[in-house]
Amino acid sequence: MTALMDALQGLIDLDTDIFFSINRMHNTYFDYFMNAYSGKWVWIPMYAAIWYVMLRNFHWKVTLLCMIGLALTITFADQACATWIRPYVERMRPSNLDNPISEMVHIVNNHRGGRYGFPSCHAANTFGLAFFLFFLFRKRWLTVFIMAWALLTCYSRVYLGVHYPGDLLAGTIVGLIGAWLIYHLFVKVSGYKRAAHVTHVNAPILIGGLTIVGMLVYAGIRTFL
């Protein structure tokens, strides 16, 4: 038991070290950018583009089931993290004022999040979406973009001081499990068979990319003007 506890403490210490190595690399420009990137509503245009791809490639009934599947994936991921796991693990966020390291943590706009952060809902939700789309389309560049998008979301949470890397890894696993389960349920219910040729998959990449460019410009304006 002692050896197990020592190993666990070693992982916690490593997690904290990695957290600080990321959180300490900050400046005003990226404070604005990461804060904007970590937002939820700013990604609505990209979500609309994903819906557009479904509408252009699937029957409306399949599209409806896809949207329900995505909603269930995100609901599962969010509830698994916030309701089922966090109250039992009770790992405080690094930014929480009751955490001894909180005074050394760089935060943005005085945002500290809730009390507990393991697992990360942001990681679970974004990777749940990313993995569901991977299972659904299996398109290389869309997969690369959406996985990079989810990964940068995770990075932003450490940068903003509200999550340890371990929180994000656990959230990613929750998102993967949720996406895998709901996708296979979706296939069983809808009889979905992946089409050989899927069109308009660049739409989410374009809209998501333009959104990121907009954030970069916004951060520049707030920093230098």
Where does each model-flagged region fall?
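Hydrophobic, lipid-facing residues on alpha-helical transmembrane segments of integral membrane proteins
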Residues: W41, I68-A80, W84, L169, ...
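Membrane-water interface at transmembrane helix exits
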Residues: W51-L55, A77, C81-E90, F134, ...
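N-terminal signal-anchor transmembrane alpha helix
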Residues: M1-D6, L65-Y88, I212-Y218
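N-terminal transmembrane-helix/juxtamembrane module of multi-pass inner/ER membrane proteins
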Residues: M1-M46, C81-H111
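Membrane-embedded catalytic cores of phosphoryl/pyrophosphoryl-handling enzymes
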Residues: H106-L225
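Interfacial segments of alpha-helical transmembrane regions
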Residues: W51-A80, L142-V144
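Hydrophobic alpha-helical transmembrane segments
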Residues: Y37-M54, I68, H122-F127, F145
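Transmembrane helix-loop junctions in multipass membrane proteins, especially transporters and channels
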Residues: L55-H59, P87-S95, V162, G166, ...
